[in-house]
Amino acid sequence: NKFYHQGLEKELKTGHLKNFQKHLSYTESPEFADFQLCLDQFARLNTNVLFIIPPVNARWQKYTDLSATMLKQFDQKIHYQLQSQGFNNIVDLSDKGNVPYFMTDTIHLGWRGWLAVDRRVNPFLSKQQPQPHYTMNDKFYSTTWQQLPPSQLAQYQQTNK
């Protein structure tokens, strides 16, 4: 596997990647505002979008000590950003990282993963979909949202209805 030999083999053998993602968090990032920019463009063009949330390979996650709790919290935060604005076509595969052959490496889908995606993409593309109705909210550009700790998501949802 080219990815393994060129990118991971040496690092794995020396142990440099062991626990290296222990303090990594996807939940607090300016990229939530970047994502909002994409969503605004989809809404402006009235584009019906199917979002796919892929898993992380569970063995990789364990080896690098990437927090399962943090990944679930990221999942909740991105779902809220999407669904609160009317983006309801979401294929959430984030719980499939432990399924054999679902992933080919750390973050890339394997044949089972692509089969799962195809089973959702095919009907989305081949069947008539209802016209989307988006209600965009500029609060997702705010630093408050970008840096919102997952522990405050429920409170944020209540105060920003």
What residue spans do the PLM features occupy?
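C-terminal regions of proteins
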Residues: 76-161
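Secreted/periplasmic serine-hydrolase-like ester/acetyl group-modifying domain
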Residues: 1-45, 137-161
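Extended hydrophobic/aromatic segments used for targeting, binding, or gating
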Residues: 27-33, 38-104
